């Protein structure tokens, strides 16, 4: 196959490209320039997408003897990932920028350009696997290295995107093996630390970064009964389930800590309550996709596992496509309550190791009806915020 290897400058993508070459494919390397000002992105142990990363990727491509290019997607990244991140927080939601990047940049804009140029697939260093299903169609599966599995952040891929994706690290049992292989191949970034957190927030201070862009407007912190018990410096910086950073002047009657239950951008308030009030018995959303062949009857309840964070444990659940308040939604009912679920998060559903699909969470139903106020539909929240 003619393969476009996306090379971030890290060890995983370098080894993935090396394996593609070793497998006999016609490989070309590409590094994505995602920032208008690369110097503002993280460098060193916490970084990705910097000028240094571009040079690391070029050196790896030279070692492999493959052509190498840098593609500028900075404008698209700013609009589809960075601006979207800000807008979601302003609407009281909690986005996942890595998933948005996969959905709109790496496996959309980049893949589209690759196919236009005659490539058959895009190769990345993600820990996931593409296997042939019983119907002969490609399926997205978890990686063999469960601790490194990245199928969650790839849950936004469609059947067409999966068919043109190549993940050479999917069957690798551990990251240590990848590093050892890189060392043996003479790849300079063999011991380069993994990147973490959000690449476009230089110091990891999400609250400060957001304040610089949307302002820090003081507001009230409310308890479940609507009583003002504290103040904040900007509701946009909070997320459901958060405990740190709450300036609460009135202690809880039982002396226990309180957590963010809801963000209300319309009146710039944050609602807090006890930890048990975070328990959720149902999640749903209208923005859902299937990763390959959907369930035979998605309108009938089917068994699955649901995962709501990249490194969370999957939870057994039942799911079905239903009409709720006039909109078609994927509704998921976990066997045991989920905790700290925020509008804007992504729920990925699995059948064993296979990714079935994903949904952006718009609505939640509390498992403790009297412990927290009802969470409004995120579409209404966004409308109230002027989105």
From Swiss-Prot:
Picking any one GO molecular function of the record gives: ATP binding
Span list, region Interaction with tRNA: 148-150
Question: Which reaction is the catalytic activity of this chain?
Answer: S-sulfanyl-L-cysteinyl-[protein] + uridine(34) in tRNA + AH2 + ATP = 2-thiouridine(34) in tRNA + L-cysteinyl-[protein] + A + AMP + diphosphate + H(+)
Task: Give disulfide pairs as residue numbers.
Answer: 101-199
Q: Which GO terms describe its biological process?
A: tRNA wobble position uridine thiolation
Residue intervals passing through the bilayer:
none
Q: Which GO terms describe its cellular component?
A: cytoplasm
Q: Where in the cell is it found?
A: Cytoplasm
Per UniProt, ATP binds at: 6-13, 32, 125
Q: Which UniProt keywords apply?
A: ATP-binding, Cytoplasm, Disulfide bond, Nucleotide-binding, RNA-binding, Transferase, tRNA processing, tRNA-binding
* Chief subcellular location: cytoplasm
InterPro entries registered for this protein in UniProt? MnmA-like, MnmA-like_C, MnmA-like_central, MnmA-like_central_sf, Rossmann-like_a/b/a_fold
Query: What's the EC number here?
Result: 2.8.1.13
Residues flagged as site, Interaction with tRNA: 126, 345
The active-site annotation reads 101, 199
Q: Which family does it belong to?
A: Belongs to the MnmA/TRMU family.
Q: Describe its function.
A: Catalyzes the 2-thiolation of uridine at the wobble position (U34) of tRNA, leading to the formation of s(2)U34.
Q: What is this protein called?
A: tRNA-specific 2-thiouridylase MnmA
């Amino acid at each position: 196959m003619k393969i476009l290897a996306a090379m971030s400058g890290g060890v995983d993508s370098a080894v993935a490209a090396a394996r593609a070459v070793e497998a006999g494919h016609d490989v070309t390397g590409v590094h994505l320039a995602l920032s208008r000002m690369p110097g503002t992105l993280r460098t060193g142990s916490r970084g990705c997408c910097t000028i240094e990363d571009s040079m690391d990727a070029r050196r790896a491509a030279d070692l492999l003897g493959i052509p190498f290019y840098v593609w500028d997607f900075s404008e698209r990244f700013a609009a589809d990932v960075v601006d979207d991140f800000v807008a979601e927080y302003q609407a009281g939601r909690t986005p996942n920028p890595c998933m948005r990047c996969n959905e709109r940049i790496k496996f959309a804009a980049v893949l589209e350009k690759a196919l236009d140029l005659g490539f058959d697939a895009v190769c990345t260093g993600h820990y996931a696997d593409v296997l042939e299903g019983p119907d002969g169609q490609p399926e997205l599966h978890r990686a063999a290295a469960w601790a490194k599995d990245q199928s969650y952040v790839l849950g936004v891929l469609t059947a067409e995107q999966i068919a043109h994706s190549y993940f050479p690290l999917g069957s690798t049992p551990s990251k240590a093996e990848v590093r050892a292989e890189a060392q043996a191949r003479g790849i300079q970034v063999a011991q380069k630390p993994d990147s973490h957190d959000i690449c476009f927030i230089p110091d990891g201070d999400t609250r400060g970064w957001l304040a610089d862009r949307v302002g820090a407007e003081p507001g009230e912190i409310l308890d479940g009964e609507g009583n003002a018990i504290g103040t904040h410096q900007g509701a946009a910086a909070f997320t459901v389930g958060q405990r740190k950073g709450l300036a609460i002047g009135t202690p809880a009657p039982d002396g226990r800590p309180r957590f963010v239950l809801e963000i209300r951008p319309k009146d710039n308030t944050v609602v807090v309550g006890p930890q048990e009030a975070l328990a959720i018995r149902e999640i749903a959303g209208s923005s859902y996709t299937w990763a390959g062949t959907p369930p035979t009857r998605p309108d009938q309840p089917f068994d699955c596992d649901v995962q709501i964070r990249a490194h969370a444990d999957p939870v057994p659940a039942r799911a079905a496509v239903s009409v709720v308040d006039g909109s078609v939604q994927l509704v998921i009912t976990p066997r045991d309550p989920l905790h700290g679920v925020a509008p804007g998060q992504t729920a990925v559903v699995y059948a064993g190791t296979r990714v079935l699909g994903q949904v952006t969470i718009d609505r939640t139903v509390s498992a403790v009806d009297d412990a927290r106020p009802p969470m409004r539909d995120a579409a209404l929240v966004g409308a109230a915020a002027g989105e």
